């Protein structure tokens, strides 16, 4: 076949495809040859497998496809399949009368491209040329991959060699250049740090710069960068220490300020003795005068159990004990300051009206004051201070006649002037006030016919004397308060030199004293007592409607 004929065959493909048929059965071999020729294939036949192998070895490039029987006497078809695939790399189609899947699987595993059953049909042979085309494409792909992989391997090897050469050159350059070597790390020892501190102290913290510090330290292998880094850390630590010192100083100042104010307990309006009293609502006011110093007394909180002694206004020219920082409201619960309105307002309250003087309540509650004489200046700008009278020890046996009508004794609470304001120019208390225990009496008139008309009993009713009367006064002046719910604070009794004591007794002591005097005295003719037939016994006192409880 000439070159031109081969080109024509290739152009007319699959016409003229070269096929080698191998089968030990001559009948089957003749039928297979006839069918292949009808498909216009170029056919070569043989009945021995060994002969077919020799033909293939002699003519490697003269066959395109091999069709071989499975069962042959001289050589198994699968053996021929392996040899052809290894040596010539041609597509092989297996032909057999066994349709067992085991044979088909075995042929596929050994490299067969197809498995045909006898008798073979012409329709199956018409499309066998596709295996030739597929095989040729696989060969081209393998060749391209092999060429590409070879080129890639060469390129990778070349790049790797170049990279290794460059690294070797860089290592050589690093070894040759001493400046390119890594600088050793500086360890700031205690000695080195002391030199640094000495240099900073010599230059000053503000003027210390790394270059000057380095010159003063004069240490080998110490660079300017090392000194600059250490100086920055030193300044940060110094700033932190200074900030902590400032905070501690501020905290100490605040603590000392509160230590000076530690005596200001209770309500905020009652200040220490060295502070001025602010003028405003809810405060004792007296202009710019100082509030006298009171010693702390735990009995002050016992409002309803203390003896309700008279408050005597005194001058503020008494000596002050500056070491005592007590507060008159120390330890006083807020609940005890709230006096119930239903207990007849027994404790007259102070008010906070501006420019109004302090008042001296005189709710005696069958009690009498300690004999003492006092006087107040009539200057309205003067702010008097209050002292608590001495604990009462006995009841008065003498009654002083008063001008109070019997009908007024049992009048309603609203008609009684328990509290009243007075003008700031007027004196606080009548200067002719007689504080003799005998002058303070109790005139009740229990036998009055008006007693059945009211449900409230007032233990004491006193009449106010005219201002120009020089006689003894039996009723303390009362001034009305704008806050009737505010309770009266009771505390210490007066001692010599204006000092205060804290031995005020409770109402239990008073009642016991009353019972003792009742048993020891048999004549009550001097007092105006009328108990409507009741015996003077303990049951009589239980009938008295005190504004507060007699129990402790």
Swiss-Prot record:
Gene3D superfamilies in UniProt: 3.40.50.2300, Homeodomain-like (1.10.10.60)
Residue numbers spanned by region Disordered: 139-181
UniProt keyword terms in alphabetical order: Activator, Coiled coil, Cytokinin signaling pathway, DNA-binding, Nucleus, Phosphoprotein, Transcription, Transcription regulation, Two-component regulatory system
Post-translational modification: Two-component system major event consists of a His-to-Asp phosphorelay between a sensor histidine kinase (HK) and a response regulator (RR). In plants, the His-to-Asp phosphorelay involves an additional intermediate named Histidine-containing phosphotransfer protein (HPt). This multistep phosphorelay consists of a His-Asp-His-Asp sequential transfer of a phosphate group between first a His and an Asp of the HK protein, followed by the transfer to a conserved His of the HPt protein and finally the transfer to an Asp in the receiver domain of the RR protein.
Phosphoprotein among keywords: yes
Residue positions where 4-aspartylphosphate is found in the record: 69
CDD domains on file: REC_typeB_ARR-like
Residues in Response regulatory domain copies: 18-133
Coiled coil: 151-173
Subcellular location: Nucleus
Motif (Nuclear localization signal): 182-185
GO BP terms in the entry: callus formation; cellular response to cytokinin stimulus; cytokinin-activated signaling pathway; maintenance of shoot apical meristem identity; primary root development; regulation of anthocyanin metabolic process; regulation of chlorophyll biosynthetic process; regulation of cytokinin-activated signaling pathway
DNA-binding region, residues: 185-235
Entry comment describing in which tissues the protein is expressed: Detected in the whole plant. Predominantly expressed in roots and leaves.
Compositionally biased spans, kind Acidic residues: 163-177
GO molecular function terms attached to this record: DNA binding; DNA-binding transcription factor activity; phosphorelay response regulator activity
Gene Ontology cellular component annotations, sorted alphabetically: nucleus
Recorded family membership: Belongs to the ARR family. Type-B subfamily.
Function: Transcriptional activator that binds specifically to the DNA sequence 5'-[AG]GATT-3'. Functions as a response regulator involved in His-to-Asp phosphorelay signal transduction system. Phosphorylation of the Asp residue in the receiver domain activates the ability of the protein to promote the transcription of target genes. Could directly activate some type-A response regulators in response to cytokinins.
Subunit structure: Binds the target DNA as a monomer.
Name of the protein in its database record: Two-component response regulator ARR10
Organism: Arabidopsis thaliana (Mouse-ear cress)
Gene: ARR10
């Amino acid at each position: 076949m000439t070159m031109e004929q081969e080109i024509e065959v290739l152009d007319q493909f699959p016409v003229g495809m070269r096929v080698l048929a191998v089968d030990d059965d001559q009948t089957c071999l003749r039928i297979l040859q006839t069918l292949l020729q009808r498909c216009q294939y170029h056919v070569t036949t043989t009945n021995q497998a060994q002969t077919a192998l020799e033909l293939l070895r002699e003519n490697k490039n003269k066959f395109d496809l091999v069709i071989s029987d499975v069962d042959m006497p001289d050589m198994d078809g699968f053996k021929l399949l392996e040899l052809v695939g290894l040596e010539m790399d041609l597509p092989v189609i297996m032909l057999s009368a066994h349709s067992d899947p085991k044979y088909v699987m075995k042929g596929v595993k050994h490299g067969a491209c197809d498995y045909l059953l006898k008798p073979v049909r012409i329709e199956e042979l018409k499309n066998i040329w596709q295996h030739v085309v597929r095989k040729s494409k696989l060969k081209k792909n393998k060749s391209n991959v092999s060429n590409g992989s070879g080129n890639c391997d060469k390129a990778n090897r070349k790049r790797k060699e170049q990279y290794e050469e460059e690294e070797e050159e860089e290592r050589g350059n690093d070894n040759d250049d001493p400046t390119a070597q890594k600088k050793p790390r500086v360890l700031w020892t205690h000695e080195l740090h002391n030199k640094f501190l000495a240099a900073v102290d010599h230059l000053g913290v503000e003027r210390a710069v790394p270059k000057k510090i380095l010159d003063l330290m004069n240490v080998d292998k110490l660079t300017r960068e090392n000194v600059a880094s250490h100086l920055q850390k030193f300044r940060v630590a110094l700033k932190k220490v200074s900030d902590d010192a400032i905070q501690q100083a501020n905290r100490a100042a605040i603590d000392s300020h509160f230590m000076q104010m530690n005596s200001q307990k209770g309500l905020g309006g009652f200040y220490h003795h060295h502070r001025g009293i602010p003028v405003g609502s809810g405060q004792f006011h007296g202009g710019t005068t100082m509030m006298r110093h009171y010693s702390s007394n735990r009995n002050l909180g016992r409002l309803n159990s203390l003896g309700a002694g008279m408050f005597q206004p005194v001058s503020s020219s008494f000596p002050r004990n500056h070491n005592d920082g007590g507060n008159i409201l120390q330890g006083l619960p807020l609940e005890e300051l709230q006096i119930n309105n239903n207990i007849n307002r027994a404790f007259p309250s102070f008010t906070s009206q501006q420019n109004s003087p302090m008042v001296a309540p005189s709710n005696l509650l069958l009690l009498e004051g300690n004999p003492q004489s006092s006087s107040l200046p009539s200057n309205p700008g003067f702010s008097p201070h209050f002292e608590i009278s001495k604990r009462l020890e006995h009841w008065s046996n003498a009654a002083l006649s008063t001008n109070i009508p019997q009908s007024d004794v049992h009048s309603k609470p609203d008609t009684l002037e328990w509290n009243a304001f007075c003008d700031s120019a007027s004196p606080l208390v009548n200067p002719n006030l007689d504080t003799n225990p005998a002058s303070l009496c109790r005139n009740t008139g229990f036998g009055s016919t008006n007693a059945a008309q009211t449900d409230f009993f007032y233990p004491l009713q006193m009449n106010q004397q005219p201002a120009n009367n020089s006689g003894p006064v039996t009723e303390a002046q009362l001034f009305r308060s704008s806050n009737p719910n505010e309770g009266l604070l009771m505390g210490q009794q007066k001692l010599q030199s204006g000092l205060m004591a804290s031995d005020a007794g409770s109402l239990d002591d008073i009642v016991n004293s009353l019972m003792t005097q009742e048993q020891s005295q048999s004549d009550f003719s001097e007092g105006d007592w009328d108990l409507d037939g009741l015996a003077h016994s303990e049951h009589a006192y239980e009938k008295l409607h005190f504004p507060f409880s007699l129990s402790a």
